Regions:
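Alpha/beta-hydrolase fold nucleophile elbow
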Residues: 154-165
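Membrane-embedded segments
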Residues: 66-147
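An N-terminal hydrophobic leader/cap segment in hydrolases
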Residues: 13-62
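Short beta-strand/loop motif that positions the catalytic acidic residue
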Residues: 227-228, 233-236, 240
Length: 295
C-alpha cells in the first residue's frame, strides 16, 4: 500500500513543483515577458532616424527623468510651417521594437496630417537607459508631457495623447492624472487592454493560474471612467490575435467622456490595424471635428 501511495502522490508532487517554479518565474521574470524590449534583434542598438523617412524638420532628443534615467525621443514637425496644424501628438508605441520602427506612422501624422509629433522611448527600450516597469513608464510618460508643455514653440498647439497596445495603458494613466490642467484636448487609443491580469488568460492561456503573482497591473478599466474632460477615439482591429477586441469594446463602454468615437478596422490584427484602410482618415476626422472644431 505504501508503495502504491508513493506512485500516486508522485505526480502531485511533480505538479506542485512545476507550479512553484512557474509562479516564481512569472514573479521574477514577468517584466521580460510584459516588456520584450530586445525583440527584434538589434532593437536596443539599431534605431532608424526621422531623416530616413522624409522628415527633415526633426529633433533627436535625450530627456532626463526625475529618477535619473535618460529617454530617447524624436520631435517631428511639418516641413511647411504655414500648413502645420496646431496639434502636438504625444505618441506611446506598442510593445517590442523601438521608436524608430514606428517612424512610418509618424511620417503620415507629420507629412499627411500636418501634426507635430513627439514620440517618446520608454526606459529600457531603444536607446533609453534603465529597465522598464509600470512605475517607471508612468514617470516616462509624465516626462514627455512636461517636455511638450515646456516648449515655448509648442505652447499654442493642442495636445493629443495617442497610445497603441501597452502604449494605450500608458496614455490612459497619463491622461487621468493630467486632464484637470485642461491642456490635453484629445485621446486616441488603439488595440489596448483592460488590465495585465485580464490579458494573461488571453495571451498565455496555460499561465492563467499564475495571474495572482503578477506585479505589473496597468488597470485601465479602473481609470477609463475617470476620463471625462476630452474627446476619445477608439480604433479597434477586429482580428486582433493578442488583445481580444472585447477589451477595447469594454473600455469604450466604460468611457464617460462627453464625446466618444468608436471606429472598427474589420481586417486589422494587433500589428496591422494601423495599415488598414481608413485608419488615418479616422484620426484626421477626429482631430478636425473634435480637437480643432473645424467641422
Amino acid at each position: 500500500m505504501s508503495t502504491l501511495w508513493g506512485w500516486v502522490r508522485y505526480p502531485f508532487y511533480t505538479m506542485s513543483s512545476m507550479m512553484g517554479l512557474g509562479s516564481a518565474a512569472l514573479y521574477y521574470y514577468q517584466n521580460e515577458i510584459i516588456y520584450p524590449r530586445n525583440i527584434p534583434a538589434g532593437a536596443r542598438t539599431e534605431v532608424p532616424r526621422p531623416s530616413q523617412y522624409e522628415m527633415p524638420n526633426s529633433e533627436e532628443l535625450l530627456l532626463p527623468t526625475p529618477d535619473g534615467e535618460t529617454l530617447s525621443a524624436f520631435l517631428m514637425r511639418p516641413e511647411n510651417k504655414s500648413q502645420a496644424a496646431p496639434v502636438t501628438i504625444l505618441m506611446f508605441h506598442g510593445n517590442a521594437g523601438n521608436i524608430g520602427h514606428r517612424l512610418p506612422i509618424s511620417r503620415i501624422l507629420v507629412n499627411g496630417l500636418n501634426c507635430t509629433v513627439l514620440m517618446l522611448e520608454y526606459r529600457g527600450y531603444g536607446l533609453s537607459t534603465g529597465t522598464p516597469n509600470e512605475k517607471g513608464l508612468v514617470i516616462d510618460a509624465q516626462t514627455g508631457l512636461d517636455y511638450v508643455r515646456s516648449r515655448e514653440d509648442l505652447r499654442r498647439n493642442r495636445i493629443v495623447v495617442y497610445g497603441q497596445s501597452i502604449g494605450g495603458a500608458v496614455a490612459i494613466d497619463l491622461v487621468t492624472k493630467n486632464q484637470s490642467a485642461g491642456d490635453i484636448k484629445g485621446l486616441i487609443l488603439e488595440n489596448t487592454f483592460l488590465s495585465i491580469a485580464k490579458m494573461i488568460p488571453a495571451a498565455l492561456p496555460a499561465a492563467k493560474w499564475l495571474t495572482p503573482f503578477c506585479h505589473e497591473y496597468w488597470r485601465s478599466e479602473l481609470l477609463m471612467p475617470k476620463i471625462t474632460e476630452m474627446p476619445v477615439l477608439f480604433l479597434s482591429g477586429l482580428q486582433d490575435e493578442i488583445v481580444p477586441p472585447a477589451h477595447m469594446k469594454q473600455l469604450f463602454k466604460l468611457c464617460q467622456a462627453k464625446t466618444v468615437v468608436w471606429k472598427e478596422l474589420p481586417y486589422g490584427d494587433h500589428n496591422s490595424t494601423v495599415g488598414e484602410k481608413g485608419y488615418f482618415e479616422y484620426i484626421d476626422a477626429f482631430l478636425e471635428e473634435h480637437v480643432l472644431g473645424k467641422r
